[in-house]
UniProtKB/Swiss-Prot annotation:
Residues 25-88 form a propeptide. PANTHER family: SOMATOSTATIN. It comes from Carassius auratus. This is Somatostatin-1A. One of its GO terms (molecular function) is hormone activity. One of its GO terms (cellular component) is extracellular space. Somatostatin inhibits the release of somatotropin. Belongs to the somatostatin family. Keywords: Cleavage on pair of basic residues, Disulfide bond, Hormone, Secreted, Signal. Disulfide bonds join C103-C114. Residues 1-24 form the signal peptide. The gene is sst1a.
Length: 114
């Protein structure tokens, strides 16, 4: 029983490593290409620096977004709850808006009747 669990865990681990290595492959090829260009051309060093900076910034933004997701979800839930409470508090006591005869409003480049 224990050996089958270990085998399953190892199989899942190897599968996860294989997926991670495959997903990282294109960036390695791009980096290798930029390194070859930088050796041949001095302007390639600047391109390499831009690429590494962009890669670093994208990783930081992704980590920040992952860290903020739970907080944003809780804030959104709180806002929805407040909105629902306000709607319930207003209830049927609010009378529908009465429109005057011949009244027109200017909305988005056209006149609409009130």
């Amino acid at each position: 029983m224990l050996s089958t669990r270990i085998q399953c865990a190892l199989a899942l681990l190897s599968l996860a490593l294989a997926v991670c290595s495959v997903s990282a492959a294109p960036t390695d090829a791009k980096l290798r290409q930029l390194l070859q260009r930088s050796l041949l051309n001095p302007a390639g060093k600047q391109e390499l620096a831009r690429y590494t900076l962009a890669d670093l910034l994208s990783e930081l933004v992704q980590a920040e977004n992952e860290a903020l997701e739970p907080e944003d979800l809780s804030r959104a839930v709180e806002k929805d709850e407040v909105r629902l409470e306000l709607e319930r508090a207003a209830g049927p006591m609010l009378a529908p808006r009465e429109r005057k005869a011949g009244c027109k409003n200017f909305f988005w480049k056209t006149f609409t009747s009130c």
